[in-house]
């Protein structure tokens, strides 16, 4: 009996020690993608993404780009991702200093949610989801010449089939001919 009680207490303690995550739902015209965000590992990047979520700014945006083995064939460093969150420039908020994968230890694996960017700390609203392992997007990776990598901050927990459906849409030079509408992105309680 004491052993059972001790094991129950230990289980409760372990549950409380697990890092806190934030859950979000990405509703698209092709289905729902659920993600968990890691604010304890990537606080600035998660806060940046949630500013857009909480303001409802992703409603009626889209997934507009899909990188595939076929349309990346000419590049030296190939990736497989879908990119979304295209907003009019007037709705973009100021970029913030975001964490690299060297700082967070969150790597670009299958289903990783990450912020798109041009130069370091230029990420605003655009994000992408990895299909398969994408080490060239991590800190030190060669996809971006500055080798700073991209800011991974979450993981798909449900809906990778939807991610792959989006990736499979007809495209022209990586840009979807008919972008897939993001109906909304909301937090899941």
What do the predicted segments below correspond to?
Residues 15-189:
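Cyclophilin-like peptidyl-prolyl cis-trans isomerases
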